[in-house]
Amino acid sequence: MEKKYFGTDGIRGKVGERPITPDFILHLGWAVGRVLAQGRQSKVLIGKDTRISGYMFESALQAGLSAAGVDIRLLGPMPTPAIAYLTRTLHAKAGIVISASHNPYYDNGIKFFSSAGTKLPDEIEVAIEAELEKPMQTATSSRLGKAERVVDAAGRYIEFCKSTGPASVDLSELRLVLDCAHGATYQVAPEVFAEMGADITVIGASPNGLNINENCGSTALESLQHKVLECKADVGIALDGDGDRVIMIDQRGEIVDGDDILYIIARARQRTSKLTGAVVGTLMSNLGLEKALATLGIPLMRSQVGDRYVLEMLQCNGYSLGGESSGHIICLDRTTTGDGIVSALQVLVEMVATGHSLYELKSGVVKYPQCLINVQVARSINLHDNNAIINAMQEAENQLGDEGRVLLRPSGTEPVVRVMVEGRDISQVNSLAQQLAQEVAFHLGNPQICP
């Protein structure tokens, strides 16, 4: 059954436009209660990031769950991975996150964790949507759910993050700059690194409900780069609005992205004989990562784009480490979902253990130039049914040989085909990408190429 509301990462959109409206979220809370938390002793956790609309949707979810007879535990502003962890350790039936991740403040969304702290399977999302088609029926007064705050939520998560590194690790020799994106990590992230001894300078930690991800965080790195150089710091750490992704900056002010971080952690796990099987990336992971891992004898498997698919491939194959270029890093030997704080900590631990700088640790990955062009299309189409496009792809692949890749990928959320070409020669890469983009635009009937 095709889903009407759920995308690859829950439900997301612009506040005030359906489905991101108070009445829909009220109904959603009731539907979730009906599906996930049946039974008198059921409880569901609710956490949020720092968007101003989070208060409104928290109240709506709370009312809907209560109407379904479900007890609620309120976490307040809390990183997405913290909600996954607390859902599991507090033995809740489900965890609900109110966040639109790295999006601007005027967007918001709802995503869910199962009792095991993992994302919901498709069949549960389908069941929730089926309940949404029914009118709400409020439980009798004696069976309404109650709400309480979890007063030690932040402390529990801080201790968990610290526990993902060796007990003896001391970060006192490291000078860090931490950018919390005015988001959900603004309280807990500084505490984690400070309690482990690091000398930290914090930016992006003054949320006002409207400034989340605004010129800060993992998608806007300029301020952090400047601060790292100004403070002569060893490392910059940029988290996103809900704390599930991280990008780092080395002492030279250069970006260390998700591919670099994945390589560093993989090499660290291999060094300590703790790497399980292959590393999982995505179709967009840089070819340089694949080549670098190959020199270590570590295979790279590629999933569809999206941390949900990375996690599925990890679980299906019994692997422990995967991630995306965007900074979603999943360390299944430490936690159940992408966690920016935990991932950054693994890198810092490796710096201390080896005595190497972040620049030195990432130097094993030589990135291949990559050109990505978005082509607006008039209609959805199976690209593999178009012989002209297939022939153009094959010709580009032949020109690149073993030293490049071509990827054409329809967007799952907008009428766009993403054309990506990767190779050693940047001029060849750009030329082939432009040729393929023009071919796609010509055959799909809306010859407009977006930046």
UniProtKB/Swiss-Prot annotation:
CDD domains: GlmM (cd05802). Its EC number is 5.4.2.10. The keyword Isomerase applies. PROSITE patterns: PGM_PMM. It comes from the Bacteria. Pfam families: PGM_PMM_I, PGM_PMM_II, PGM_PMM_III, PGM_PMM_IV. The modification Phosphoserine is found at residue 101. The active site is at 101 (phosphoserine intermediate). This is Phosphoglucosamine mutase.
